[in-house]
């Protein structure tokens, strides 16, 4: 398998990690699914997977790529609130559909999910 196919396969697992394990609370779940409905290019995750292929375990490589995407997405959601943006990537922004408070809270939820993954990556085995 060539390295680009391997990266694509790993990106699938990154996406699965990001979209999985969402809180059962209906309103949070609805907004979270809305934010991650499109796959996007995942350039940050791609770069992480490529650069970390030298010395990282597969589990941590995928988790680190997911962390980067989650942190990036959380900053975009918060940025839309601060800038009072109506659209992000051609779609209505969270704060435009729901409210600024929803945007801040879901951004914080996404940050928290990333931090939980960070703690897991940092555990001594």
Question: Model-predicted segments: where are they?
Answer:
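A generic signature of intrinsically disordered, low-complexity regions enriched in glycine/proline
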Residues: 83-87, 112, 124
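Divalent-cation-assisted or electrostatically stabilized phosphate/pyrophosphate-binding catalytic cores
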Residues: 88-112
């Amino acid at each position: 398998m060539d390295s680009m196919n391997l990266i694509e396969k790993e990106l699938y697992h990154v996406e699965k990690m990001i979209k999985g394990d969402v809180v059962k609370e209906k309103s949070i779940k609805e907004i979270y699914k809305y934010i991650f409905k499109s796959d996007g290019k995942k350039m940050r995750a791609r770069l992480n997977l490529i650069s970390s292929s030298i010395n990282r375990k597969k589990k941590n490589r995928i988790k680190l790529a997911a962390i980067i995407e989650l942190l990036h997405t959380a900053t975009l959601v918060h940025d839309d609130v601060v800038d009072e943006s109506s659209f992000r990537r051609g779609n209505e922004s969270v704060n435009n559909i729901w409210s600024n408070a929803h945007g801040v809270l879901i951004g914080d939820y996404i940050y928290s999910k990333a931090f939980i993954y960070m703690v897991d990556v940092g555990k001594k085995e």
